[in-house]
C-alpha cells in the first residue's frame, strides 16, 4: 500500500497555494537529462514484511566472516550486553539533547555524569556534552584555539603529519574557508614520533596552537611533555588528540608537561559504541576552565533550586547558535546523545580498574601480535618508539597486495600506508582485548603463507 497521505485534491490545493501548475514544476531546476523518465522499471515489486525479513536474512548469510586487525581510528572492543540494554530504555533513547531541556532532568544528569567522567579521564577542568566525532572535534578545537589564544593573532596551527590523516583532511575541509592554515610538521623516520627538531623552524613564529596526538596514527607514543612545554614556551596552545582507552594507562593530557594541554579532543567510539560502517560515533572535547567560554557544544551544569533541591541545566548558552547566531562558537547546536549515553554506561560499568584491564590487554595483545609477525622473514617493525595498541610493520612485498591476499584467507590484516604516507610496503595493525591467542596465530600463519 502507498504511504503518501495526500489525495489528488490535497495536492491540487497545495500547488494552487504556491502558484505551481504541477509537482514537476517544483523540480524544474534539475536538468531534464538527469531525471528518470517514467517509472523506475528496474525496481522490483514490493514485498511483505515477512518476505523482506527472509530476503535480508539470506543476504546477511552471504557475508564472509573474517578476523579483523584494522584500527586506524575505529576499534573493535567488547561491549557488555548491559550497556545497550540500558541505553535503549525509553528513558534514555534519544539522539540528542532535548529541547526544553530542564524538563528532562534524567537526561541532563546523564550528560553531566558523562562530562565528569571525561574530565577525570583526561585530567582537564571542563567537558562539553560531546561533538559529532573525533575528526570534526579536531576542527572545532582548531577554531577554538584561534579564539582562546590571546597571545597570538595568527590564523595558523601546527599539525604533525603523524596525526590521523582522516582527522587532518576533515579538519582541512571545515577550516579552509575560514581563513585558517594548517602547517604540517614531519615525523622522524626512525622513531615514528614528532621530534622537537622538526619544530625548530617554527620557534619564535606566531602560531595559535600545536596539535599533539597521543598515541599518534602510527601507534607511536609521542614525547608529550617536551612537545607541550615547547608549544607553551612559544606562546602556542596545545590541542591533544587522544584515544580514551589509552588514558587508563598513559599520562592524561591535563598533566602533560609543566602546565598540561589546553584543549583535548578524541573519538569516543572505543567507549561502548560498536563498529558500524563509520558511525554513528561521538567526539569528546575538554578544556581548561579559563577557555570554557570559547568551547563549542552544549554544557550541562549542576545547581540548586529555590527549595534547595539539586537540579541540572544547560549552562553558558550564550556561546551557542540558538542565541548568538553567527557569533556563536560553533554551528554545533546539539550533541551525540545516544552514543554518549552508551559511553557513560560503559565507563561506569567497567570503572577505573575495568578500563585499565581493557587497556592493558589491548597493549599486551598488540605486542604479542607484533612479536609473532616480526618473527617471519622480511617482516619488521617500522619504528622504534613504544606503542599502545597499534604498530606499523614493513613487509617484503607491497602492502596492498599482501592485504588482498590475507583477506582471501579471512584475515583483515590492517591498513596500508601506501596512500597516505607513500610507505608502499607498510601496514598499520591493531589488536584489542577481543583478539584471542587463536586469532593472533591465525594472522601469523596466514601472513607466512602469503609471503612464502
Curated annotation (Swiss-Prot):
Enzyme kind, highest EC tier: oxidoreductase
Catalytic activity, EC: 1.4.4.2
One GO term (biological process): glycine decarboxylation via glycine cleavage system
InterPro entries per UniProt: GcvPA (IPR023010), GDC-P_N (IPR049315), GDC_P (IPR020581), PyrdxlP-dep_Trfase (IPR015424), PyrdxlP-dep_Trfase_major (IPR015421), PyrdxlP-dep_Trfase_small (IPR015422)
One Pfam family here: GDC-P
Keywords, sorted A to Z: Oxidoreductase
Catalytic activity: N(6)-[(R)-lipoyl]-L-lysyl-[glycine-cleavage complex H protein] + glycine + H(+) = N(6)-[(R)-S(8)-aminomethyldihydrolipoyl]-L-lysyl-[glycine-cleavage complex H protein] + CO2
Gene3D superfamilies linked: Aspartate Aminotransferase, domain 1, Type I PLP-dependent aspartate aminotransferase-like (Major domain)
Alphabetical list of PANTHER family matching this protein: GLYCINE CLEAVAGE SYSTEM P-PROTEIN, GLYCINE DEHYDROGENASE (DECARBOXYLATING)
Family designation: Belongs to the GcvP family. N-terminal subunit subfamily.
Function: The glycine cleavage system catalyzes the degradation of glycine. The P protein binds the alpha-amino group of glycine through its pyridoxal phosphate cofactor; CO(2) is released and the remaining methylamine moiety is then transferred to the lipoamide cofactor of the H protein.
Protein name, per record: Probable glycine dehydrogenase (decarboxylating) subunit 1
Gene that this polypeptide is encoded by: gcvPA
Amino acid at each position: 500500500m502507498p504511504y503518501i497521505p495526500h489525495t489528488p485534491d490535497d495536492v491540487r490545493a497545495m500547488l494552487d497555494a504556491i502558484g505551481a501548475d504541477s509537482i514537476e514544476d517544483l523540480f524544474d531546476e534539475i536538468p531534464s537529462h538527469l531525471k528518470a523518465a517514467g517509472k523506475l522499471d528496474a525496481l522490483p515489486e514490493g514485498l511483505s514484511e515477512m518476505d523482506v525479513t527472509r530476503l535480508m536474512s539470506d543476504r546477511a548469510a552471504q557475508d564472509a566472516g573474517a578476523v579483523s586487525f584494522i584500527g586506524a581510528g575505529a576499534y573493535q572492543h567488547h561491549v557488555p550486553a548491559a550497556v545497550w540494554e540500558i541505553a535503549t530504555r525509553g528513558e534514555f533513547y534519544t539522539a540528542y539533547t532535548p529541547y526544553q531541556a530542564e524538563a528532562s532532568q534524567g537526561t541532563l544528569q546523564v550528560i553531566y555524569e558523562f562530562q565528569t567522567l571525561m574530565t577525570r579521564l583526561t585530567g582537564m577542568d571542563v567537558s562539553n556534552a560531546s561533538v559529532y566525532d573525533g575528526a570534526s572535534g579536531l576542527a572545532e578545537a582548531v577554531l577554538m584555539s584561534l579564539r582562546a589564544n590571546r597571545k597570538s593573532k595568527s590564523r595558523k596551527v601546527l599539525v604533525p603529519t603523524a596525526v590521523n590523516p582522516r582527522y587532518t583532511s576533515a579538519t582541512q575541509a571545515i577550516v579552509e574557508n575560514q581563513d585558517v592554515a594548517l602547517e604540517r610538521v614531519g615525523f622522524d623516520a626512525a622513531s615514528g614520533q614528532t621530534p622537537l627538531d622538526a619544530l625548530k623552524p617554527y620557534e619564535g613564529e606566531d602560531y595559535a596552537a600545536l596539535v599533539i596526538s597521543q598515541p599518534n596514527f602510527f601507534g607511536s607514543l609521542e614525547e608529550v611533555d617536551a612537545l607541550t612545554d615547547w608549544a607553551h614556551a612559544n606562546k602556542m596552545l596545545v590541542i591533544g588528540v587522544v584515544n580514551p582507552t589509552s588514558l587508563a594507562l598513559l599520562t592524561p593530557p591535563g598533566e602533560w608537561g609543566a602546565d598540561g594541554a589546553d584543549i583535548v579532543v578524541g573519538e569516543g567510539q572505543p567507549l561502548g559504541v560498536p563498529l558500524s560502517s563509520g558511525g554513528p560515533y561521538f567526539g569528546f572535547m575538554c578544556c581548561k576552565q579559563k577557555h570554557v567560554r570559547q568551547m563549542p557544544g552544549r554544557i550541562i551544569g549542576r545547581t540548586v533550586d529555590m527549595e534547595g533541591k539539586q537540579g541540572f541545566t544547560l549552562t553558558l548558552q550564550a556561546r551557542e547558535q540558538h542565541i548568538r547566531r553567527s557569533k556563536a562558537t560553533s554551528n554545533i547546536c546539539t550533541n551525540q546523545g545516544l552514543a554518549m549515553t552508551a559511553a557513560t554506561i560503559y565507563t561506569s560499568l567497567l570503572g577505573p580498574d575495568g578500563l585499565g584491564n581493557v587497556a592493558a590487554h589491548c597493549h599486551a595483545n598488540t605486542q604479542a601480535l607484533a612479536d609473532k609477525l616480526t618473527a617471519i622473514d622480511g617482516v619488521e617493525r617500522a619504528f622504534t618508539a613504544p606503542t599502545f595498541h597499534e604498530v606499523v610493520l614493513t613487509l617484503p612485498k607491497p602492502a596492498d597486495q599482501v592485504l588482498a591476499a590475507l583477506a582471501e584467507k579471512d584475515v583483515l590484516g590492517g591498513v596500508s600506508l601506501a596512500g597516505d604516507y607513500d610507505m608502499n610496503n607498510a601496514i598499520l595493525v591493531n589488536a584489542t582485548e577481543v583478539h584471542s591467542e587463536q586469532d593472533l596465530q591465525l594472522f601469523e600463519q596466514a601472513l607466512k603463507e602469503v609471503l612464502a
